[in-house]
Amino acid sequence: MTKTLLIEEKAYLGGTATGAQVSMFMGFADGEPDRPQQGIIKDVMDGLAAAGGTPGIETIYLCGRRDLDIPVIPYESEILKDLIFDLVDQAGVELLLHTRVIGAQVEDGVITALTIHNEQGVQTVSGKVVIDASFHGSVAVSAGCRWEIGDEKGVLQPGTLMYKMAGVDIARYEQVSQPERERLAQKGIEEGCLYVNNLLARPLPSGTIYSNMSRIRIDPLDAAQWSRAEMEARRQVRRISRFFIENVPGFE
């Protein structure tokens, strides 16, 4: 009988979708937001809806422009954590949390086994098929696969730290016009409190607001640089949230 083993370094599944509180599936509808979704994403959407974790597919307009419409699904990340555990359990998947892959054994160009590490020490697991869904493609790289990072100049998309705010008067905030949002954003940039030229804060079913407004240049392959970035990102979030409280209607 075929068995599936899922290895995860964290205490939860879902990667950045859950652990980083991304809170929005974006651009998966292939330009047809009204078409019923199938497969795994349908299971996820149905489960989130049943648990009150999503309002379903919505359309957002980047920078308030009607020609930049994108279908998205806002969701509650904690509800998604529970849902993914349930789906994995129902599918009969064996799970190893708090476990990291530290190497791959390759024969004739095929991965035959993985070296893993957890509190039980270093172990080896083998399988016929290995699917690398790691953040950096670490399994594929350790197996000798080619890799690239950044554009032709090595420039990467900046890092960001998602955060949430509660107690917001969402109705008042949603009345703020796009020109006013851009004016406030420019004010925040000039004061050294904001880092993007728009107010990127949207509501979730729970009534909280999630935001993606910090921006940090970082090489994610440099652990020391990444560590400093984690601290700076939190400083940025404090500046951003304070600016919202002092300047944006609904956040007082």
Question: Language-model segments: what does each one mean?
Answer:
Residues 97-123:
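A conserved hydrophobic secondary-structure block that centers on an alpha-helix together
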Residues 3, 8-103, 107, 157-158:
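Conserved N-terminal/central alpha/beta ligand/cofactor-binding core
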Residues 2-3, 128:
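Nucleotide donor/acceptor-binding cores
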Residues 120-129, 133:
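Core beta-strand elements of the Rossmann-like FAD/NAD(P) dinucleotide-binding domain
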Residues 137-252:
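Rossmann-like dinucleotide-binding core of oxidoreductases
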Residues 7-10, 133-134, 213-214:
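Active-site-proximal beta-strand/loop segments in catalytic clefts of secreted hydrolases
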Residues 118, 134, 143:
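Glycine-rich, N-terminal phosphate-binding loop of Rossmann-like dinucleotide-binding domains
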